[in-house]
């Protein structure tokens, strides 16, 4: 995993509440896929968060 993805994920999770994790993120399932899935499920935001290599797509109320 790239360091920039790790830093981005750590910033996103630091102080913000992503309440519901729906899937494992992968090379083909990153923020650009995760966020629209969360929004379609009624959440306000979503992104791949966590520490490499265990990123999860989590949604925010």
UniProtKB/Swiss-Prot annotation:
Cystines in this chain: 21-59, 25-48, 34-57, 38-58
InterPro entries linked to this entry: Defensin-like_dom
GO terms (BP aspect): defense response to fungus; killing of cells of another organism
Alphabetical UniProt keywords: Antimicrobial, Disulfide bond, Fungicide, Plant defense
Pfam families assigned: Defensin (PF24552)
Coiled coil: none
Nucleotide-binding found in the keyword field: no
Family: Belongs to the DEFL family.
Protein name according to UniProt: Putative defensin-like protein 72
Gene source species: Arabidopsis thaliana (Mouse-ear cress)
